[in-house]
Amino acid sequence: MQFSSYEDLRPRLLAGEVSCEEVVRVYLERIERHGDDNIYLTVFRDEAIERAAALDRKLREGGEPGRLFGLPMAIKDNISMDGAPLTCASKMLEGYRSVYDATVIRRLFDEDAIFLGKTNMDEFAMGSSNENSAFGPVQNPFDPSRVPGGSSGGSAAAVAAGLCMVALGSDTGGSVRQPAGFCDVVGLKPTYGRISRYGLVAFASSFDQIGVLSHSSMDAALVLGVMAGSDPHDATSSSHAVSDYCSEVSGVSVKGLKIGVPKEFFNEGLNPDVSRVVLARLEELRLQGAELVDITLPKSDHAIAAYYVLVTAEASSNLARYDGARYGYRSAGATDLSSMYVESRTEGFGPEVKRRIMLGTYVLSSGYYDTYYKKAQQVRRVFQDRYREALSRVDVIAGPTSPFPPFGIGAKTADPLEMYLADVFTVPASIVGMPALSVPVGYDGENLPVGMHLICNFFEEGKLLGIARHMQRPVSRLNPAL
């Protein structure tokens, strides 16, 4: 039997044509074969088989199956699961085990999802290539010599390689969407506050959102519907009503759809192949009845400058808790309290994390706060107003997910600024807090994936996923059906 999505698998599970345990064992066998790709940091082999057997028994005994009954999922290793390792791909947390479940984990578990393991990532979610992991880089399933994107590179690669059906990631400035584009899968960042952050290890608290990676928009809609909603444990979670996302996805039509195309997203710095693929797909949609509307979003390049001021400032504050005193790595060479703090952080954090802590401390320091941090917050408000105005005239804003295709491992590590520019098209949606996603639309001249980036207005996730469903090319040439 062939199952390319949970939308296809679920009815077969409920009909008894295939069991949860059979499905889980297939995925676990694949994970074992792909061990050299460094995609998973932890695999819950025994727990997943036991969980699958329990769900099969529940169905046989007439129990009511949950909305995600038997869905094999992977979890990014910065999301807490009670009793499971929680490393954030950092030496600082190596060996640490979480003592509670994140809200999203509890909600998914209650709807009968099955967790296969925890995926690799950039350390503390800081990076765009998955090369910053203390446990080594993840290989892109399309070309092992290339990066999968980051920071949720392990989650994106797991979905692309068929090592899970759906994965959770986190997105601060593009960390779900950019690797989704590099790995030919759908990657959704919801509206800020749509999903509880309780149990997500903080990088930049006013930006961080848990996101979904999947092969289909409908699978993402289903998982989003389970996770979304207010949470008393997270004061920033929204009480905005949770829609029936699956119905909204089905109700979107291409005919009459107004697609805003910013000229700033198609400048001379864009890879020609990426531009060609994205524009060709937009033209195909125009021929199907959509309207392409030229829009302008001036000073778009200022978004990434403001973003790196704000997120490094927040990271500097959030990561102050890792001091070697309460949990995590403690230097063996410390001789007093002060040296314990300094040496534990020096040895426990990787180069990129230390770089961002130093930048954040600088922009928050006396004499520079107004010049950098306050100014960046003002720029953030300007972008919120510009995007709100643009989306009052169009249904969706479309452009490339990344300015270039997946690049070689090690190709950009010597130039942090060039690496930061990998997020130039994804950062604006994070600055404004609007929902955005990457959807596969084709391949470049080297047969590498190209993603299209879509942004909708606040809390329009159903509409966004419905538009993506029309834009998406057929299932990835790589995806191994079950």
Swiss-Prot record:
Name one cellular component (GO) term: glutamyl-tRNA(Gln) amidotransferase complex
> A GO molecular-function term, please?
ATP binding
Keyword check for Protein biosynthesis: yes
* InterPro entries registered for this protein in UniProt: Amidase (IPR000120), Amidase_CS (IPR020556), Amidase_dom (IPR023631), AS_sf (IPR036928), GatA (IPR004412)
Could you state one GO biological process linked to this protein? translation
- EC code(s) of this entry: 6.3.5.7
Catalytic activity entry: L-glutamyl-tRNA(Gln) + L-glutamine + ATP + H2O = L-glutaminyl-tRNA(Gln) + L-glutamate + ADP + phosphate + H(+)
Residues of the active site are K76 (charge relay system), S151 (charge relay system), S175 (acyl-ester intermediate)
Q: Which UniProt keywords apply?
A: ATP-binding, Ligase, Nucleotide-binding, Protein biosynthesis
What protein family does this chain belong to? Belongs to the amidase family. GatA subfamily.
Q: What does this chain do? A: Allows the formation of correctly charged Gln-tRNA(Gln) through the transamidation of misacylated Glu-tRNA(Gln) in organisms which lack glutaminyl-tRNA synthetase. The reaction takes place in the presence of glutamine and ATP through an activated gamma-phospho-Glu-tRNA(Gln).
Q: PANTHER family, per this entry?
A: GLUTAMYL-TRNA(GLN) AMIDOTRANSFERASE SUBUNIT A (PTHR11895:SF151), TRANSAMIDASE (PTHR11895)
NCBIfam families given for it?
A: gatA
Q: How does it assemble?
A: Heterotrimer of A, B and C subunits.
Q: What is this protein called?
A: Glutamyl-tRNA(Gln) amidotransferase subunit A
Q: Which organism is it from?
A: Chlorobium phaeovibrioides (strain DSM 265 / 1930)
- What lineage does the source organism belong to? Bacteria, Pseudomonadati, Chlorobiota, Chlorobiia, Chlorobiales
Q: Which gene encodes it?
A: gatA
